[in-house]
Amino acid sequence: MNTLITPAQAVASAFTDGEYLAPEAIGEGDIAAAEQRYIVPVIGRAFHEKLLAGLHAGFTAEYLAAPVALFTRIAVQPRLDIRTGQCGTVAPKSGSYQPADAQSLRELQRSLRRQARTLLRLSLIHISEPTRLRR
């Protein structure tokens, strides 16, 4: 599957140093779905295809990698907050950590979405300037 960023890039960009997550927790399908849902409607399918082909790699790295990573996190966060196993679907809990309450999860989602949208708007400002991204 062809995506603008790799799972390792998504993890490195969307999660802070204190939040360990193995890159395998995010798949290319997660990234592709986030791109289709949040990025393509804004930049257009034709431009997205050009970016996937490697054109404007600097623009992708500087302006789109972070919002793609954050939108990917928004999409996978609910799945990361629970585990499914032989006992069904459960929230992880240990002596040191407790599952976040619903309000905290909503606030995290809002914060991530706000940051991702702001970064995506910044990319639009960049490509709307007449001297940028000609081809």
Enumerate the predicted regions with their spans.
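Short, intrinsically disordered N-terminal pre-domain segments
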Residues: 1-23
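Short, charged/polar micro-motifs that form catalytic or ligand-binding hotspots
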Residues: 24, 58-66, 102, 106
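Glycine-centered helix-coil hinge/cap
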Residues: 24-53
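Short, glycine/acidic-rich hinge or "gate" loops at secondary-structure transitions
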Residues: 49-53, 85-94
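Elongated alpha-helical scaffolds
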Residues: 61-89
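Small-residue hotspots
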Residues: 67-70, 74-75, 109, 115-123
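An exposed acidic His-Trp-rich patch
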Residues: 88-118
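Residue-level detector of conserved catalytic or cofactor/ligand-binding positions
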Residues: 123-133
